């Protein structure tokens, strides 16, 4: 089957399974099985399609989206986004089958698979207007998946603001070029400088969807109250479509100005640092992971910002390094954040708690989930040999290249960005230690944690599968990075002083070194050892006498107190009249439902 056929079949499977899941929604396990199996098959097709594009000599594939009559194009860049969506949605779909067996869980197959279908269409359509419509359908589905009226209300309000900005850009572009087809726009603007006033509203609108700080208000609330599969899709699919839109408007209509790339770099650095800092303060594991998603969105923006800066300055080496680093980290983030959200969901499934202060000792109760979560957390902290390390290392190289260029702004920003990213990495390592230590080590703090059992086998399989993807993405990085580089048709001399097999061996050896040192330096064991209760100054030892998440983060909280207060000082919600009204959530959800229905009918009728 051709690449275009695979994409068409994937969208069809998503849509058909969504409809069938809705039909059988009253029988929740059956609805979940239909949505999960259909979503898994469609996601596997996207992975095959994306991989085929990267491996084929012919990198550009064009055609029509079946039943919708929308022109689509699958090139190297589109293929990377298809991989990011498919690799995340595959374990999420499998996980969702068992998730529907929990008595407190509502059937979500219609919204989840409709979201995935819209996201797939969004990253392959060739018309900027179609991109906005598909992104809107996806965002509305996500708003209903938040599981909380307050967070859904905030997402709907901010999302409509972003949609208005995107629509404004569409109107400006139509008025200027007479078309919304990206290929025709770029043909008219070949070798010309971009008019940023046309595209800036769209950039802000897509940045809001991507959760770039300070446009991130919806993200932590939406993740905290949503189901684990939905929260995973928010981070790995919805926000990635926002990044796709940001990159699209950055490159459309000619060569972007230098300040555009610098703006993306600044936005990425602010988002990465603030997201990592706020994550360390959280105890709700899904809210914590949401802030870490913001951190990684910032890191991806740093890579894409370096790429756009290279385009503006016609520096091919900076272009390639920024593109490889940003895009590889985009895929890697989808993998390890899927691992973490699904792992957190498996823990909730057995304990009913998302607050890590109420857990502890889960590692002994759920060993495979614990191991997979450790892999995901190490990848999140960019520790070798996991996949998070590879993408960030290439982004560091782009900063080093920037600091040796001819432009003063590059020589100024390169070292500053490298130091900022290093500090952000240190915060991520602290967060890794906090989450794993407080949740999976130590003694259980509640009866639910003490009585926890292993998760259902399909849940465990999904989490372990995502963790294996993280490991493969790190060890195989020397061979995968050239494929990512080939997705963008610019060649540059970017060489390495170490061979690819040697890099892979070093990545494998890094985590083994501590164990080798332990074996080498260990002394003789005592012939007889006695065991007793821990000494706590004469008091009886209690399970609560362990390191808490609050105590672990307290030094950083005191050091950065002014920055942490910003989210309270700069909260725009308090300024909106009627926002706290009890009737506001129901009213906004009603409007969202009508808008979603109208958009779906319009898209279907256009295809008919």
Model-derived segments and spans:
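Aromatic-capped, Gly/Pro-kinked transmembrane alpha-helices
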Residues: 480-505, 521-608
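Alpha-helical transmembrane segments and their helix-start/interface "positive-inside/aromatic belt" motifs
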Residues: 28-41, 153-160, 286, 290, ...
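Hydrophobic alpha-helical transmembrane segments
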Residues: 72-86, 194-206, 409-425, 496-514
């Amino acid at each position: 089957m051709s690449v275009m056929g695979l994409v068409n079949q994937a969208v069809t499977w998503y849509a058909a399974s969504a409809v069938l899941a809705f039909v059988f929604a009253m029988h929740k396990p059956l609805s979940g099985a239909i949505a999960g199996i259909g979503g898994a098959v469609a996601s596997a097709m996207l992975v095959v399609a994306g991989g085929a594009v990267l491996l084929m000599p012919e990198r550009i594939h064009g055609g029509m989206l079946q039943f919708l009559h929308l022109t689509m194009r699958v090139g190297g860049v589109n293929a990377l986004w298809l991989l990011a969506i498919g690799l995340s949605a595959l374990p999420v779909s499998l996980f969702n089958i068992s998730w529907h067996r929990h008595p407190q869980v509502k059937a979500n197959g219609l919204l989840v698979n409709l979201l995935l279908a819209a996201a797939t269409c969004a990253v392959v359509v060739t018309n900027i207007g179609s991109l906005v419509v598909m992104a809107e359908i996806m965002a509305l589905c996500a708003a209903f998946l938040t599981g909380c009226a307050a967070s859904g209300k905030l997402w709907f309000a901010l999302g409509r603001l972003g949609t208005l900005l995107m629509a404004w850009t569409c109107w400006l572009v139509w008025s200027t070029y007479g078309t919304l087809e990206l290929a025709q726009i770029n043909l008219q603007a070949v070798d010309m400088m971009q008019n940023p006033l046309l595209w800036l509203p769209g950039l802000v609108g897509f940045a809001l969807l991507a959760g770039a700080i300070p446009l991130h208000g919806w993200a932590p609330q939406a993740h905290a109250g949503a189901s684990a599969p939905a929260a995973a899709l928010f981070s790995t699919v919805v926000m990635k479509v926002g990044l796709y839109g940001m990159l699209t408007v950055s490159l459309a209509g000619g060569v972007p100005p230098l300040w555009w790339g610098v703006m993306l770099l600044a936005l990425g650095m602010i988002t990465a640092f603030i997201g990592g800092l706020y994550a360390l303060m959280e105890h709700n594991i899904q809210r914590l992971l949401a802030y870490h998603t913001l951190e990684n969105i910032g890191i991806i923006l740093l890579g894409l910002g370096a790429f756009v800066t290279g385009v503006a300055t016609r520096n091919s080496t900076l272009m390639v390094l920024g593109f490889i680093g940003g895009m590889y980290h985009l895929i890697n983030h989808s993998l390890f954040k899927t691992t973490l959200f699904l792992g957190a969901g498996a823990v909730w499934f057995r304990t009913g708690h998302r607050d890590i202060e109420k857990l502890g000792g889960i590692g002994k109760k759920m060993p495979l989930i614990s191991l997979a979560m450790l892999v995901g957390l190490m990848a999140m902290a960019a520790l070798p040999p996991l996949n998070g390390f590879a993408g960030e290392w290439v982004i560091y190289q782009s900063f080093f290249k920037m600091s040796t260029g001819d432009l003063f702004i590059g020589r100024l920003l390169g070292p500053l960005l490298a130091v900022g990213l290093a500090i952000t990495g240190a915060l991520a390592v602290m967060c890794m230690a906090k989450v794993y230590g407080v949740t999976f080590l130590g003694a259980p703090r509640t009866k639910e944690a003490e009585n926890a059992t292993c998760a259902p086998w399909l849940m465990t399989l999904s989490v372990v599968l995502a963790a294996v993807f993280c490991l493969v993405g790190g060890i195989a990085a020397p061979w995968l990075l050239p494929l990512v580089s080939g997705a963008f048709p610019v060649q540059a001399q970017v060489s390495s002083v170490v061979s690819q097999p040697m890099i892979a061996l070093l990545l494998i050896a890094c985590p083994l070194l501590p164990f080798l040192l332990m074996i080498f330096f260990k002394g003789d064991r005592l012939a007889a050892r006695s065991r007793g209760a821990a000494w706590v100054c004469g008091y009886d030892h209690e399970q609560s006498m362990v390191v808490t998440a609050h105590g672990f983060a307290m030094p950083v909280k005191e050091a950065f107190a002014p920055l942490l207060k910003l989210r309270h000082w700069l909260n725009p919600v308090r300024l909106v009249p009627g926002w706290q009204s009890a009737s506001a959530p129901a009213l906004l959800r009603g409007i969202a439902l009508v808008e979603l229905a109208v958009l779906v009918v319009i898209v279907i009728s256009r295809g008919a």
